[in-house]
Amino acid sequence: YGHDQGDYAIKRICNEIIVSIRQSDSLYRIGGDEFAIILVETNISKARTIGENIRKRIEKVVAVGQDKITISIGISSFDFNNESEDEEKLFKRTDNALYESKNHGRNRVSVITA
């Protein structure tokens, strides 16, 4: 499809994510087609629900040409009270959850906790 269609898809995905999260949450693009969302003061159950809502919205409304776009989502948590916890461990767990989604058929949400 080319760069123009890819850019269009990424913008649409961002818009769908933005309307699915709260103002206190943050969306970051961390790679070509990879994003991170920080859900402030959100437990794993609520994060999974938000992830599923985002996945369903994108599956329903984002397309390039005749092809529907799907996403895979990985979720993990960060415990501020655990002194051995750090951002690198959180990112690694979340990345592992993402690859679990990708390895099990894509278009799904996976959770790995500490």
Predicted regions and their residues:
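Nucleotide second-messenger and two-component phosphorelay signaling modules
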Residues: 16-26, 62-66, 104-105
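Conserved long alpha-helical elements within nucleotide-processing catalytic cores of c-di-GMP signaling
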Residues: 1-19, 28-32, 36-37, 44-52, ...
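Residue-level recognition of strand-loop junctions within catalytic nucleotide-signaling folds
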Residues: 38-42, 59, 78-79, 114
